[in-house]
């Protein structure tokens, strides 16, 4: 459903990446501060917390896949080869982030997680079925793309930083590599007041 020529990917690989060192071993905030981070679903002490983590992972994955669906048609009308390659790299990394979230759901949350991961692939931005409305809006031309990514990628950086302190260690460990890749996304539209 991404819709671009696979040969454009070059040697890019959709690997699952973790940074366990940066994720830390202790919960940093809240009622469970100082306790070991949860590494498995059944270590999470309350069902409402498990549900909230599944929801956060699902929304994050949904936005990653949605942005690729929303923007991939622009590759055919890129103003320059540099713009095309930059947009393609953004789309590859966003797609990888979506796969990372699907991996977390399938690996750590049993049948419920598998169902939620399947929904990530069933929803589609062109059909207007993504969770967040801004990812269902059409991106019709490159000016839309530049403006959208300028603001959304900055918001995404703060969202990933927030998730990097998750009490669920696999989610926190996913954020280090995603933040490194997000810095490339931000580089495509930095402003003097927003250091990367």
Q: What role is predicted for each listed range?
A:
Residues 174-186:
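Alpha-helical membrane segments in multi-pass integral membrane proteins
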Residues 187-196:
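Single conserved hydrophobic/aromatic residue that forms the stacking wall/gate
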Residues 91-115:
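Carboxylate/His-rich catalytic cores and anion/metal-binding grooves
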Residues 63-70, 97, 152-159, 185:
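Amphipathic, well-ordered alpha-helical segments in soluble domains
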Residues 141-147, 158:
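Active-site-adjacent structural elements in folded domains
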Residues 74-85, 159-177, 193:
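Inter-helical turn/loop segments and adjacent helix faces that build the functional surface
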Residues 1-85, 107-139, 143:
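Terminal targeting/low-complexity segments that flank the catalytic cores of oxidoreductases
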